[in-house]
């Protein structure tokens, strides 16, 4: 009803019409479950897991052209009748889009920043906010800040002199 939805991996599968597990590989017994019905997709689970590093270009408006690098790790194959979320360099399609509902198998969507910026700008405009007023920082900078916060927390919780001594190192 006008609210954007993004499903990644299992979330993408659940946004579809059905999830078919003919061998019980995911659920422990053969069964077919109804999905949320927000995307025109059908997923069939299998014993084999797909693991791949991938690059793709977003096809879905309003993010079309954003370059992605990420990975897939999932069981099953999803057949999509809707528009693709992205295209692989070989022309293959990835994911599915219907209206403001987006589904993809690609983990790491927001690691490069191009999709993050496009998505944030789109959401700002939908809410009547000028994207240039939004305080966005590059993903790598954010990640470093979060690691610094984590490191400070670990240092505060440990006797670092004892840790350095146990490692045979001098305190820096």
Regions found by a protein language model. Name each.
Residues 57-99:
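Catalytic beta-strand/loop cores that center a nucleophilic Ser/Cys/Thr
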